[in-house]
From Swiss-Prot:
EC number(s) reported in the record: 1.11.1.6
Gene designation per UniProt: CAT1
Subunit structure: Homotetramer.
PANTHER family: CATALASE
Family as reported in the entry's similarity comment: Belongs to the catalase family.
One GO BP: response to hydrogen peroxide
CDD domains noted in UniProt: catalase_fungal
Name listed for the protein in its UniProt record: Peroxisomal catalase
Keyword Metal-binding tagged: yes
Keywords (A to Z) from UniProt: Heme, Hydrogen peroxide, Iron, Metal-binding, Oxidoreductase, Peroxidase, Peroxisome
Role: Catalyzes the degradation of hydrogen peroxide (H(2)O(2)) generated by peroxisomal oxidases to water and oxygen, thereby protecting cells from the toxic effects of hydrogen peroxide.
Positions contributing to heme binding: Y336
One term of GO molecular function: heme binding
């Protein structure tokens, strides 16, 4: 049976396109609730877009434990090989707006929500293992340079390269971004990385620093700069279409999950800080260890309800998993939930895609607010009342934690020559693959050619600290593309 058309209060409407008026061609009547209701709702359809990661695609799936890592982490959803957990993953670009191209040269967001029996776990990752900054106060400045000039409202190569060359700790991520990894062929054919260091613990009270890797079972495929640009013009929703159609056709993408681990003693001996988001952990010294696999096998039924309203936060953890002292991660613990309250409202966790499946959310002091739709805990007191028994579940046996000692001090983690070491190693790695060094130099040159000469000279010097061959190749093409008088 077909549904009956109604207005928002459920009243049947016999003619949806008729409007009440004085005669057939007279003025409209304010009492026409169908018209007023429809227009008022239309005026409020849009919510604020994400300030970063605005353009995205998502799908549901399942995570399965493939290997026992209970010696590292006692999280309940990992306690048994073969155990399965429902998930929702959202992929995204970072800098573009909602209508921007999926193939833009940009990092890709790779956020996954695990609906576990002990609450929702959000792993909010990217497709690159490092990032541009390690001082969180730089984040708003950095993002502004990746967006639009406030005067012209155009993307601005001067802003872009002025910031990066002034903050040289960015070099490693910039090398990744301007390699062909910066333009993935699809969301299915890219990896995901925690980037940040986390702390996981076992039931003995032992804890470990952890980095997580999601390795695409489809392999890595990329686009050249020219291929990505052509697709941006011909099909800006290319990655969204690819993901949706493949899942609809039963071609379910999957990723294998690995961890790298360090003890506190190993971290103290490492040649870099485990809290430095601009560095990777060498695989030879800190090998990958498999623990699971996840498959995306179900498309959303409604994009707005399930993808646009999906809200992830690294502060959403489960027992035996916690953040490290990584300063950028620490700032994200606040910022993500704060932006969701702005975009979606104070009760964003009641939206179905964000709601824990256990139904076991009990925090009686967090009540009321706009769009409270879950019963609001009924008649229960809105505080922890002494006459209402509450269970407090103990889950952590950790006794031996990090010890921090020092005065409160403002600290700017400035770049040093050591920040170019891993970028130099990446340059050598690219030589192993056909044309990848040439593609990197070309991709940088095409972008930097749009900057002023003074900024271009800083770009040449910036990459010269990685390799003079790289800097020379960039300079040669830049001057061909934008000859100087």
């Amino acid at each position: 049976m077909a549904p009956t058309f109604t207005n928002s209060n459920g009243q049947p409407i016999p003619e949806p396109f008729a409007t009440q008026r004085v005669g057939q061609h007279g003025p409209l009547l304010l009492q026409d609730f169908n018209l007023i209701d429809s227009l008022a709702h239309f005026d409020r359809e849009r919510i604020p877009e994400r300030v970063v990661h605005a353009k995205g695609s998502g799908a549901y799936g399942v995570f399965e434990v493939t290997d026992d890592i209970t010696d590292i982490c006692a999280a309940k959803f990992l306690d048994t090989v073969g155990k399965k957990t429902r998930i929702f993953t959202r992929f995204s670009t970072v800098g573009g707006e909602l209508g921007s191209a999926d193939t833009a040269r940009d990092p890709r967001g790779f956020a996954t929500k695990f609906y576990t029996e002990e609450g929702n776990l959000d792993l909010v990752y990217n497709n690159t293992p490092v990032f541009f900054i390690r001082d969180p106060s730089k984040f708003p400045h950095f993002i502004h340079t990746q967006k639009r000039n406030p005067e012209t409202h155009l993307k601005d190569a001067n802003m872009f390269w002025d910031y990066l060359t002034s903050n040289e700790e960015s070099i490693h991520q910039v090398m990744v971004l301007f390699s062909d990894r910066g333009t993935p062929a699809s969301y299915r054919e890219m990896n995901g990385y925690s980037g940040h260091t986390y702390k996981w613990s076992n039931k003995k009270g032992e804890w470990f620093y952890v980095q997580v890797h999601f390795i695409s079972d489809q392999g890595i495929k990329t686009l050249t700069n020219e291929e990505a640009g052509a697709l941006a013009g011909s099909n800006p929703d290319y990655a969204q279409e690819d993901l949706f159609k493949n899942i609809a056709a039963g071609n379910y993408p999957s990723w294998t999950a690995y961890i790298q681990t360090m003890t506190e003693a190993e971290a103290k001996e490492a040649e870099f800080s485990v809290f430095d988001l601009t560095k990777v952990w060498p695989h030879k010294k800190y090998p990958l260890r498999r623990f699971g696999k996840f498959t995306l096998n179900e498309n959303p039924k409604n994009y707005f309800a399930e993808v646009e309203q999906a809200a992830f936060s690294p502060a959403h953890t489960v027992p035996y998993m916690e953040p490290s002292a990584d300063p950028v991660l620490q700032s994200r613990l606040f910022s993500y939930a704060d932006t969701h309250r702005h975009r979606l409202g104070t009760n964003y966790t009641q939206i179905p895609v964000n709601c824990p499946v256990t139904g076991a959310v009990f925090n009686p002091h967090m009540r009321d607010g706009a769009m409270t739709v879950n019963g609001n805990l009924g008649s229960h007191p809105n505080y922890l009342a002494s006459d209402k028994p509450v269970e407090f579940k103990q889950f952590s046996l950790q006794e031996d934690q990090e010890v921090w000692n020092g005065a409160a001090t403002p600290f700017h983690w400035k770049a040093t020559p050591a920040d170019f070491k891993q970028a130099q190693e990446l340059w050598k790695v690219l030589k192993r693959y056909p044309n990848q060094q040439e593609h990197l130099a070309h991709n940088i040159a095409v972008h930097a050619a749009g900057a002023d000469a003074a900024i271009q000279d800083r770009v040449f010097a910036y990459f010269g600290k990685v390799s003079q061959d790289l800097a020379d190749a960039i300079k040669k093409e830049v001057l061909e593309l934008s000859p100087r008088k």
